[in-house]
Amino acid sequence: MEKDKKTWSGRFSEPVAQLVQRYTASIGFDYRLAEYDIQGSLAHARMLAATGIIQPADLAAIEQGLAQIREEISKGEFEWQLEQEDVHLNIERRLTALTGDAGKKLHTARSRNDQVATDIRLYLRTAIDEIIDLIHTLQYVLLDLAEQQAATIMPGFTHLQVAQPVSFGHHLLAYHEMLQRDGQRLQDCRKRVNQLPLGAAALAGTSYPVDRAMVAYELGFDDICHNSLDAVSDRDFAIEFCACAALIMMHLSRLSEELILWMNPAFGFIRLADRFCTGSSIMPQKKNPDVPELVRGKTGRINGHLVALLTLMKSQPLAYNKDNQEDKEPLFDTVDTLKDTLTIYADMLAGLHVNPEAMRQAALRGYATATDLADYLVKKGIPFRDAHEAVAQAVRFAESKACDLSELSLADLRQFSEVIEQDVFEVLTLEGSLQSRNHPGGTAPEQVREAICRARSQLPG
């Protein structure tokens, strides 16, 4: 094949304009599908030989040629040509140069439409498996840190105001639970990714006696796509993955926001290792939490990719349209960003320095045991709404004295309810508050440790 000649140029009277060639080419980004394109081509060629569509000698030549191409790509010696448009035609051009007529037969019973859909599914299946492993790694880091901090007391917040004492380990376990659901969603998404489009050809199937089940088995697909139009035209599997990725990034963005707050000297709850921070070009004292900030920022980009893919597909008639070429860059960047974020996060949390005393003092400053006092009154027979009102008045009184509820005298507390006795001070301690939530899902250290054991049992060894 001539270098500048297109595989489809037979019915055209003039060459493609240079600007159009650059505008429509995808080789600048879809080259990363090369390994999956080769895998799909090998399986397709073996099926063609098994069904008698090509000869065994053709298959041998194709296998040898694709092996050489794979090696050239791995060594960086493969010549990617813009005029060949995409990864598929670049590989076919080289294969034909190496094998002659055998290479020209490879595309029998196949279109680039079902070819690229297969490549993307193979790529995404691998990416999902890698991302799930990275999620598990991060979960183990969270569990290790939660175990170390099971009895560390921090203020729990609502509306970013001190609400009730919680274990820092319990707080970290909340993110483990989010990631657990994230992993489950990806596992479920993988089922719909793992279906074979090859055999759908351009849109209507093929008149050749292909064995789609053979190809599916060789490539590790659970099933074939059962409608040829759907197989080549939809990208809902990629959209679903990007939705899963957006949820993961949203969860990590929430944790990032907390790390940024906790690192602020006004909180002083944690320190990030220097390797995850940067300084200021003008302020010598600055240690900026760039990694959490970028996670927060990159979450917006991942959300944008999801919307881009939804918008890409929303008005396309069946079947394949060139619009679908625009599916790859958002998908690739989503995969890359998510993998990098999970990898960095596991390392960053593993080196987190915790300041338990700062957390404790923050809990003491916010009347975090006020609900415990209300519950104490209820257990003494006071209706909850009356107890709520009495404690609200007690908090206001403590504020006027610039002290915590636990620092008020018994006489002071009895101003607000005569049922209060000396035992009230047991429930007004931070430790007492934690211990009282001793039920599954609660923040008592004992429950936190049991939750960690249960969580470990659910993760792969």
Swiss-Prot record:
SUPFAM superfamilies: L-aspartase-like. One of its GO terms (biological process) is L-arginine biosynthetic process. Belongs to the lyase 1 family. Argininosuccinate lyase subfamily. It is found in: Cytoplasm. Disulfide bonds: none annotated. InterPro entries: Arg_succ_lyase_C (IPR029419), Argininosuccinate_lyase (IPR009049), Fumarase/histidase_N (IPR024083), Fumarate_lyase_CS (IPR020557), Fumarate_lyase_fam (IPR000362), Fumarate_lyase_N (IPR022761), L-Aspartase-like (IPR008948). Keywords: Amino-acid biosynthesis, Arginine biosynthesis, Cytoplasm, Lyase. Gene3D superfamilies: Fumarase/aspartase (C-terminal domain), Fumarase/aspartase (Central domain), Fumarase/aspartase (N-terminal domain). The gene is argH. It holds the Pfam family Lyase_1. HAMAP family: Arg_succ_lyase (MF_00006). Its main location: cytoplasm. This is Argininosuccinate lyase. One of its GO terms (cellular component) is cytosol. PANTHER family: ARGININOSUCCINATE LYASE (PTHR43814:SF1). GO terms for molecular function: argininosuccinate lyase activity. Its EC number is 4.3.2.1. It comes from Nitrosomonas europaea (strain ATCC 19718 / CIP 103999 / KCTC 2705 / NBRC 14298). It is an enzyme of class 4 (lyase). Pathway: Amino-acid biosynthesis; L-arginine biosynthesis; L-arginine from L-ornithine and carbamoyl phosphate: step 3/3. It comes from the Bacteria. It catalyses: 2-(N(omega)-L-arginino)succinate = fumarate + L-arginine.
